[in-house]
Amino acid sequence: MPKIPAINPLLQAWLLEGPLSAQVPAYVERLRRGRYATHTSSRWLNGVAHFAHWMSMCHIPVHMLDEGCIDQFLRYHLPRCDCLGGALRTPMELHAALVPVLEILRAEGVIARAPAPTGPIADELSRYDAHMSSARGLAAGTRRGRLRIIERLLLSKFA
């Protein structure tokens, strides 16, 4: 198992003994491959530990996780959170830390892939992505960022 950055012992127990313990090595490896700073890695692991503790308290099995669970955690648990151990409570940082967990779970086949969006806006975004890739030669990360912006524009104007 990759070396885990230093976090509070209580949080480390939540992380290594909780429902997401099987995904911790892949998560730590992802942080290492992404060359995240030690401070960021520690904070994100803190956030994953906090989420794992909440999952345990709510008896949510790993195979039931999806974006809705993360939203529920952020909207309903955080505002009244009294968890110990200096648990991370910053919604934006927690969201950033938890999205990769879903990606790892999907890659491992633990949870189903998110359904592909459908409809005219999704079709237009797909065509625009193909154009940015083939005609413009843009990298995947650049395309994702631009697609998020265009999606918000299209949704605000046409949805």
Model-inferred region functions:
Residues 11, 16-19, 116-120, 124-126, ...:
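Intrinsic, low-complexity N-terminal interaction/targeting segments
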Residues 110-114:
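Charged interaction scaffolds used for protein-protein
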Residues 28-32, 52, 129-133:
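Amphipathic alpha-helical segments within well-ordered protein domains
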